[in-house]
Amino acid sequence: MATRRGDTLLFPTPPVVAAHAAIGGKKEGEGPLAACFDELSADNFFGQSNWEAAEKEMALRAARLCLKKAETTPDKVSLALAGDLQAQCTASSYALRELGIPFVGLFGACSTMAEALGLGAALCSAGMADGLLAMTSSHFCAAERQFRTPLSYGAVRTPTAQWTATAAGACLLRPAGEGVQLCAATFGRVQDYKIKDINNMGAAMAPAAAATLLRYLKDTGSAPADFDRIYTGDLGHVGGQLLRDLLAAEGLLLKNHVDCGCVLYDAAEQTVKSGGSGPGCCASVLCGHILPRLEKGTQKRVLFIATGALMSQTTFLQKERIPAIAHLVELRSPQQKEENG
């Protein structure tokens, strides 16, 4: 069972990530992490007739591949926790419609993967799930159409803008066994720093990442140097620097910080401005890049902090401010478990 220390859930017997899968589109296949994906498609329609159906297909492929790698079937999965950026999380619900797994829809914008992992770990730790699927996705074209402008409009992107990843990530959690350990989770509080610019999500989300990280460090008595990496997703280059500035003001130097939105693409070559974003960005980097490093023991202990801007197309048109949230999970290498006996 989990124990609570402040705002942080600790899992003395950590649930594990038994399997994971990452799917990406054309632009992701042109980036520096291309080799990390299980599957890449040069066709961003993924064989479908529209962008929204393409995202559903991508999420479905990620889920099926994850289950295949775990050598299990949908009927043996207790629950799926999933979400996306489409209205009412239709990419996730339409994908899960085909799998028949009990489904709880989540919305945390780009923070959804950490939200799903934290909730999933709590359910597994409490004995409520033997196998739990945590997954999320995003699609550049679907997100642009919903939140910004149709692609045919040809709007100029600002330097602070980020590129919504066409990607999906899925993890299968189990209460125990072999795999990367989920040792702790801290769920975020909504932060509002009066940002209204929809093309500067990093500025809106950086304070949320700082607030959640500071609470976790206080609750656990940890310091940034205790971790091989502190991953955020997805603040981009602008938001990442703002996070480091905010923490420096608190006396913390974040020398081991890596943002998923900064490593998925080559900003100099791929015209993504401030970097990647979208739930599928940090989810695919987690499943294709971070978890394999932990499995190999290249990294032993990391924090994964996913951030989300909680606006809608309606609140944006009403000129509301953009609140944000960040959820955190602590991940440890299975090799560290062996070393600790």
Segments (PLM) and residue ranges:
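Conserved beta-ketoacyl condensing-enzyme motif
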Residues: 17, 51-110, 226-241, 246
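Short beta-strand segments
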Residues: 18, 82-83, 132-138, 302-307
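Short, well-ordered amphipathic alpha-helical segments that serve as non-catalytic structural scaffolds
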Residues: 55-71, 117-119, 204-219, 285-290
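Short acidic, glycine/serine/threonine-rich loops at helix termini
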Residues: 28-30, 91-93, 143-148, 241-243, ...
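Short, well-ordered, mixed-charge alpha-helical segments that flank or form enzyme active sites
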Residues: 89-90, 140-145, 189-194, 311-313
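Condensing-enzyme catalytic core mediating Claisen C-C bond formation in acyl metabolism
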Residues: 1-52, 150-215, 219-222, 252, ...
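Active-site-proximal alpha-helical scaffold in enzymes
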Residues: 107-134, 171-173, 277-298
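A generic, well-ordered mixed alpha/beta core segment in the N-terminal half of proteins
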Residues: 93-145, 149-161
